[in-house]
Amino acid sequence: MTRMAYEYATYEKKGRIAVVTVNRPERMNALHPPANFELDAIWNDFERDAAVWVGILTGTGDKAFSAGNDLRFTAEHGRDMIRMADSGFGGLTNRTQCWKPIIAAVNGYALGGGFEMALACDIIIAADHARLGLPEPRVGLMAGAGGVHRLPRVIPQKIAMGYILTGRHMTAQEAHRLGVVNEVVPLAQLMTTALGWAEEILACAPLSIRASKQAVMMGLGQPLDVALKLGFTEAERMRRSEDTVEGPRAFAEKRKPNWKAR
């Protein structure tokens, strides 16, 4: 296991899995500009590292995944200090070309930018006490880091508008019922469950996973007949890979495949 310590986050590589933990519990894991830029650097490394195939994002403690933008910092330093990298809030919300899968392990409040980071992930596992929401209008802001765009793509528009226009929170159970969250578990089982999902993904060919994610994301919003005809770079990379030979061979030989991501 490789562990890299940052001031506002921790970054661990456990075999093929990277675990990113926001580490500002004294501020409910809310992010200020230095934390945003640290997370940008971490996700840049995650994308570049060929040895890492799945990411997990969580927060320190049992109270908050992330409470979003650090409003106290903003109040002290002014709104012009709301800065982040081009990759968006937490280095993630604008990172639309990352084809490696990322799992959000929501360990408490995921509000504002915190919820937007979770929505930018591919799978969300929530602790049973978690609450999620986009309360930005209640403090004179809007969910501009993707929340107003992603939530209506996940749940029906009218229901999404109800949350966006009121700033209401949804419980983990409500989020699961609406299809925002994949699974709800007790807090003590959260990371074990997230790691279990990651291991299940790792049982699949990594290039197949990336090709599938790219096709899903680039096909969203397209008419079906258009989406079916789109060409995808990750699919072409998959077709030319050793793994497309290894998969059928392992099946025929009744053994587990040895994926190489090449």
Task: Kindly label every feature range from the protein language model.
Residues V20, R24, L39, L57, ...:
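Terminal peptide-recognition signature
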Residues P25-M28, D62-K63, G68, H129-R131, ...:
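A short, glycine- and basic residue-enriched loop/turn
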Residues M1-D62, E76:
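Conserved CoA-thioester-binding segment of acyl-CoA-metabolizing enzymes
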Residues T96-I209, F232, R240-S241, V245-R249, ...:
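Crotonase-fold acyl-CoA enzyme core
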Residues Y6, P25, D49, G68, ...:
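Acidic-histidine catalytic/liganding microenvironments
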Residues R3, G59-Q97, A110, R138-L141, ...:
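Glycine- (often His-adjacent) and acidic-residue-rich active-site loop
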